UniProtKB/Swiss-Prot annotation:
Function, as annotated: Seems to promote the survival of visceral and proprioceptive sensory neurons.
Principal localisation: secreted
Keywords attached to this entry: Cleavage on pair of basic residues, Glycoprotein, Growth factor, Secreted, Signal
Protein known as: Neurotrophin-3
Source species: Chilabothrus striatus
Subcellular localization(s) per the UniProt record: Secreted
Amino acid sequence: IQSTSMDQGILTEDSMNSFIRTLIQAGIWKNKVPKQTARTKDGMQTTVKKTEAEADAMASQDTRLGFQPIVSVDAELLRQQRRFSSPRVLLSENTPLEPPPLYLTEEPVVLNRTSRRKREGKSHRGEYSVCDSESRWVTDKSSAVDIRGHQVTVLGEIRMGPS
């Protein structure tokens, strides 16, 4: 991957999109996993090199099952992108232990065009995933540590309108 202007200043959304395109073009996100981690009798992890035939057979089986392998990205590449800030994306060297819960963020269909026009451009319905300091997805706690390291209270329910 060649160095671009992203290394030198503030990242815009366009530069982040081009960064992701560069990763895809470089083949980092391909479905090939050349090594497999195996456990020995004493519990230690070892890295086992697969043959090309084994890797292809496993890739075709994983594709049928809908499995997408996690691909490692160079840590230096992530350090260069630390300035990118998004409530939905967190570039990290560590992968979470579980996938995030899926939330539907689409608004209900409203027949009144006037209220829809007032609401356009205002997005107050974002649902943010809250991670604790152990990089696990939290769904059942009343307090947690957010992605900036601050202690936050997790609300069980949010009441809107007059009570």
